[in-house]
Amino acid sequence: MNFEELFSVSEKVVCVTGGGGGIGRGIARTFVSGGAKVYIASRSDLSDVAAEISEEGPGECLALSVDMSSEESIKKLVSDLQELEGKLDVLVNNAALGGFIHAFEKFPTNEWDQMMNANVRGPFLLVKEALGLLATAATSDAHASVVNIVSVDGIRVAMDNDWAYGAGKAALIQLTRQ
């Protein structure tokens, strides 16, 4: 087996949440450049982004919808992937909610709930729901993979009252260790 075969993603099916910009978009582009079929999922319509990434080829990029704070939306995403592909080789939990900056004693409970739902509960539910698709893709020669994108904020002391984001990323780090 040569290097290209060992690390090939050609014909793999990949789902990247939060794939419209930044890290997620970069991950999607990289998989497409390796020949994978990539689904980018977001609350926003990413059809134009997917078309742009697909042009770079040789793989393909398509857009799906998901709200990582909604169990119903997560189940719909997995159902769509099941219908379209029947398997999932790689799941990248990249979508995250941030920007709620408050001192601890002034942090609104509803913002805490929104952040934890999107950044911890959502990835947990998505992995749980996608286990069947991941198991279908796995073979004795090639395992399916889950990649949870976290942050240094999950392991360091919070700066500028951004502690809630860090708490969520710390929880995701622990979830990943399971």
Q: Model regions: which residues?
A:
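The beta1-alpha1 cofactor-binding region of Rossmann-like NAD(H)/NADP(H)-dependent oxidoreductases
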Residues: 65-76, 109
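Substrate-binding pocket helix/loop in short-chain dehydrogenase/reductase
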Residues: 102-104, 108-113
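Catalytic loop of short-chain dehydrogenase/reductase
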Residues: 139-171, 176-177
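Conserved glycine-rich cofactor-binding loop
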Residues: 20-21
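Conserved glycine-rich Rossmann-like NAD(P)H-binding loop of the short-chain dehydrogenase/reductase
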Residues: 34-49
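A short, exposed helix-loop element centered on a Lys and neighboring polar residues
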Residues: 127-128, 177
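Active-site loop of short-chain dehydrogenase/reductase
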Residues: 12, 58, 87-88, 134-152
